[in-house]
């Protein structure tokens, strides 16, 4: 289960990406999450995934 609050979700996802995964697809596959769901939730708060930085900015 992932956090619903956008600020907590941002921190959760970026921490996972930094510490455990080389990209968002790997994280989603491993955690059985839908990439689109995460991107949609975070985009509502103005965040977008940067493949170059491997984080939402």
At which residue positions do the language-model features occur?
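Short alpha-helical "recognition helix" segments of helix-turn-helix
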Residues: 27-28
């Amino acid at each position: 289960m992932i956090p619903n609050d956008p600020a907590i979700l941002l921190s959760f996802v970026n921490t996972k990406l930094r510490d455990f995964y080389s990209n968002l697809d790997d994280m989603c596959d491993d955690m059985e999450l839908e990439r689109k769901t995460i991107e949609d939730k975070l985009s509502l708060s103005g965040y977008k995934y940067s493949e170059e930085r491997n984080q939402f900015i």
